[in-house]
Amino acid sequence: MYSLHNHTTFCDGKKTVKEMIESACRENLEHFGLSGHAPVPYENKWSIPDDEKTAEYFAEIEKYRHQCENTIIWSGLEADYIAGLSKPFSHWRKNFNCSYLIGSIHLVANAGQHWFIDGPSEGYDGGLNDIFGGDIRAAVKAYYRQTCEMLETQNPDILGHCDKVLMHNRGRYIDFADPFHLDLLKETLQLAAEKNIIVEINTRGIYRNLHTDYYPGKYIFGFLKEKNIRVMMSADAHDTDQITGEFSRLKNDLLEAGIKETWLPPQISTDPISLFNPDFQF
C-alpha cells in the first residue's frame, strides 16, 4: 500500500509532518510521501511561502523519516506551473532533497491574469467571468494547453488531478463527455504517457464532497486502459484520516475498468503494484 500525495501544516494541510507520518505508520503503508505545495510567486495561504520555509519542510521530513519500521518515507513537492512566473521544476530537484514532483495546475493564465480553479465556487465563477469573459471553452482549452506545456517543459514525475478544471463545473458550463473536452483531456493523457509521466487518480473531490468523481473521472478509465497509461492512486490528503481516502472504492472502479495495476515513480519502485495483491487493502 502507498500514498504519495499528502499535505501538512507547512502549506494548507491540517496536521504536522510528524502527525501525518505517524498516521501512515498506523495504516501500515509500505510507501508514504509528503508533497507540500511548492512556493508560487504571489502571496497566498495555501503554498509553502518561500525557499527558506521549503528547506525547513524537507528538514522536518528528514527528522521523522525513520519514525516507523515498516513504512518508507519520501519527501516530495506538488509544484505549480505558470509559464514565465513559476520557478522551473529543476529548481526544486537541484536545491532540495526532493524524491519526486507532482506537477499540477491550480492557476490558469490568460492575458496576464490567473484564474484560481481550486478555491470556493464563487471564485471559480468570478474568475471565469472576469478573466475569460465567461467563455468556458476558452478557459478549459487554456487549462489543458497549460498542462501540456508543463508536461513538455518541466517533466514532473506525476501529473496531478488532470481534469480538475471541472471541479466546480458540476454540469453547469460544460459536459465532461463533450467531445471538445474529451479530445483535450485525451491529448493531455497521451502526452503524459509519451513522457513517461504517471497519471494520478485523485480521490479528494469525492471524500470532501467537492466533486462527483475522481480527478480524472471514471468516464476516462476506459481510455487509460486502452492506451496502457500508467496510473497511481492518490488521496491528496490534508489530514491524517484522509491519506487513503476512498482508495477501496477507487481500487474497485479501476478493476471494473480492466485496470489491474498501478505505478509509482521509478525512484520509488520500478515494479507495477497489482490491485489483486492481498496486501493492497484499505
Q: What does each model-identified segment do?
A:
Residues 32-34, 101, 159, 199, ...:
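Hydrophobic residues within beta-strands of alpha/beta enzymes
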Residues 255-260, 269-282:
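C-terminal regulatory/interaction regions
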Residues 35, 104, 162, 202, ...:
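Conserved residues at the C-terminal ends of beta-strands
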Residues 53-194, 279-282:
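Extended substrate/RNA-proximal surfaces in nucleic-acid metabolism proteins
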Residues 19, 145, 187, 219, ...:
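Short Gly/charged-rich anion-binding patches and loops
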Residues 5, 24, 101, 161, ...:
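Conserved, mostly hydrophobic/aromatic
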Residues 1-83, 88, 93-95, 99, ...:
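An N-terminally biased module of ancient metal coordination in phosphate/nucleic-acid-related enzymes
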Residues 179-243, 253:
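Active-site-adjacent C-terminal substructures of enzyme catalytic domains
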